[in-house]
């Protein structure tokens, strides 16, 4: 049985609203400590942030559209690592997946991977709601070939939607057991979170962490 604390240690407690202030990020960190989440995920401009030793720091690159050149994403990623990010969630150039240019997609991810050396963690946001099932599979394979640590469903900002159980199942069937799988975007209830975990998610990107963990109880 998945406990409340099990779920907490799968959560990237997230604040990526463009209008978020320094005080908002401080409150996010305080909440994460109180809730016992695995990490906080903050905007690159918020870095560096002060966190206790047992709380990890994640950020985003090429966010939210992914529509910038690979070298720009790599430079942004390198700067976030220099600013203390331990985990980087990059958004792919979705057009490359839609056009079937998976060699180019792999090269893009590899460029960011090189900017986030181990022990840094690289998560690749596929924006699965905008992709077909076959495109999700191919994008997962490109991510694995490029050396990513995780594949991730969504930014939470795309009009096509956020995470779905179906997408997580496809990702798990493709790279589960070799790469982590992060579900993010539109996960607002404990039922949602548990469904994603059941489908194969090993990490959750949540802004509703407090409400979900309260629902799960002790």
UniProtKB/Swiss-Prot annotation:
Active site, renumbered: 89 (proton donor/acceptor), 152 (schiff-base intermediate with acetaldehyde), 182 (proton donor/acceptor)
Assigned keywords, A-Z: Cytoplasm, Lyase, Schiff base
Naturally occurring in which organism (per UniProt): Corynebacterium diphtheriae (strain ATCC 700971 / NCTC 13129 / Biotype gravis)
GO BP, sorted A to Z: 2-deoxyribose 1-phosphate catabolic process; carbohydrate catabolic process; deoxyribonucleotide catabolic process
GO cellular component: cytoplasm
Protein's cellular compartments: Cytoplasm
Chief location of this protein within or outside the cell: cytoplasm
Pathway(s) where this gene product acts: Carbohydrate degradation; 2-deoxy-D-ribose 1-phosphate degradation; D-glyceraldehyde 3-phosphate and acetaldehyde from 2-deoxy-alpha-D-ribose 1-phosphate: step 2/2
Protein name per the record: Deoxyribose-phosphate aldolase
EC number: 4.1.2.4
SMART domains: DeoC
A GO term, aspect molecular function: deoxyribose-phosphate aldolase activity
Catalysis performed (reactions): 2-deoxy-D-ribose 5-phosphate = D-glyceraldehyde 3-phosphate + acetaldehyde
Family per record: Belongs to the DeoC/FbaB aldolase family. DeoC type 1 subfamily.
Pfam families membership: DeoC
The protein's role, per its UniProt record: Catalyzes a reversible aldol reaction between acetaldehyde and D-glyceraldehyde 3-phosphate to generate 2-deoxy-D-ribose 5-phosphate.
């Amino acid at each position: 049985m998945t406990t409340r604390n099990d779920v907490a240690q799968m959560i990237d407690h997230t604040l990526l609203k463009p209008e978020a202030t320094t005080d908002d990020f401080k409150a996010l960190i305080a909440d994460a400590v109180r809730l016992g989440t695995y990490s906080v995920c903050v905007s690159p401009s918020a870095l560096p942030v002060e966190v206790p030793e047992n709380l990890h720091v994640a950020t985003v690159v090429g966010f939210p559209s992914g529509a910038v050149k690979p070298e720009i994403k790599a430079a942004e990623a390198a700067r976030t690592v220099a600013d203390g990010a331990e985990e980087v969630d990059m958004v792919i150039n979705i057009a490359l997946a839609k056009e079937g240019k998976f060699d180019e997609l792999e090269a893009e991810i590899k460029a960011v991977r090189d900017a986030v050396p181990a022990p840094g963690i690289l998560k690749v946001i596929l924006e699965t709601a905008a992709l077909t099932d076959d495109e999700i599979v191919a994008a997962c394979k490109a991510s694995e070939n490029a050396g990513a640590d995780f594949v991730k469903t969504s930014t939470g900002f795309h009009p096509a939607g956020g995470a779905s159980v179906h997408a997580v199942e496809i990702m798990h069937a493709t790279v589960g057991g070799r790469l982590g799988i992060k579900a993010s975007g539109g996960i607002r209830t404990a039922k949602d979170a548990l469904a994603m975990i059941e489908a194969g998610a090993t990490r959750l990107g949540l802004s509703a962490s407090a409400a979900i963990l309260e629902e799960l109880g002790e």
